[in-house]
Amino acid sequence: RVFRKNIKVWACADRNNTFKESVQETLLGKSTSVGTGMLPMSRGNAPGIVDIVTKPNTGGMVDLIVVKSDMSKQPSIISSRTYEQGVKAFYGAAVDAIWEDEESDSTIHNECLLRTMTTQGIVILTYTPLHGLTPLTLEFKETATLLTEGMD
């Protein structure tokens, strides 16, 4: 999907440490070589990372990533969230894209779906169902069954 405007993104993980070691490294690259992950550093007028703000007392966990795009004059913002912050950390904002890395509980996932409702945004989940058939995993399983039953 291509967004043709500046967007607000949430990148989420279960804990600060998991976020830093997985999501942050995927987006930015290793801490010693920022800009080697999915998002390059901006050079001159080129698209890419223009600013990174870290959370205090987290050993370098990112709070915000400001990304310049060639699609919009305004930058896009990627904010971090963790499930250990609780569902209240997911209240209130209209968000264009949310990446849930590792399984969240159903209340957080449902809140993420609500955050993207007014923007026609997307929610992406990347997880292995290590906790078995949780309500969230069962929801996907039931949806997949309904979709495949109608395909003859």
Question: For each of these PLM feature ranges, what is it?
Answer:
Residues 1-152:
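Phosphate/NTP-binding elements of NTP-utilizing enzymes
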